[in-house]
A protein has these predicted regions:
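Hydrophobic, aromatic-lined core segments that form the binding pocket/scaffold
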Residues: 33-158
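Generic N-terminal leader/targeting and pre-domain segments
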Residues: 1-58
């Protein structure tokens, strides 16, 4: 099961397996103000985001892509995922997957208490993870909650 999942995720998505990492950040880390500030500053300095609002928008898109991956893994492979343990990483230049786009990872667990998928999406993914992060990102001047949710939803719908 683990092998099928990892092969599927790596073949079809930007999913991490043994790539040299330059920078990594879990969703849980973004709830810390200093880490979030460093992350937004890094998107501006290293990736050319012109403003913190733009960097917040980029972050929402990355969160949306990660959410889509977790939903896919949950439905297709019945993986138990705590959304805040998901990680997005910038790979090092010597990696075979070097790109400005992050790659993603999350702990693969298939045993434990299984919650109904709709409840998991509603409670764990949306209410406990995405909504509070949008609230934090929306504090940036020049970006609205609507735009941030739209950025997340675009990837989840995809």
């Amino acid at each position: 099961m683990h092998s099928v999942l990892t092969k599927d995720m790596e073949a079809n998505f930007r999913w991490h397996l043994d790539q040299p990492i330059l920078h990594s950040l879990t969703i849980k880390d973004l709830f810390e103000e200093t880490v979030l500030n460093q992350h937004l500053a890094r998107l501006m300095s290293d990736f050319g985001s012109p403003t913190r609002a733009h960097a917040a928008s980029m972050t929402a898109k990355r969160l949306g892509y990660g959410a889509a991956l977790t939903i896919y893994a949950r439905i297709k492979h019945e993986v138990l995922i705590n959304p805040i343990d998901c990680t997005f990483m910038t790979v090092a230049e010597e990696s075979t997957k070097t790109s400005w786009l992050p790659i993603y990872s999350f702990p693969v667990k298939t045993e434990g208490v299984y919650q109904n998928t709709v409840d998991w999406i509603t409670k764990d993914l949306y209410t406990k993870s995405l909504v509070p992060l949008v609230e934090l990102l929306a504090r940036e001047k020049g970006i609205s909650r609507v735009v941030l949710f739209e950025n997340i939803f675009t990837y989840m719908k995809w």
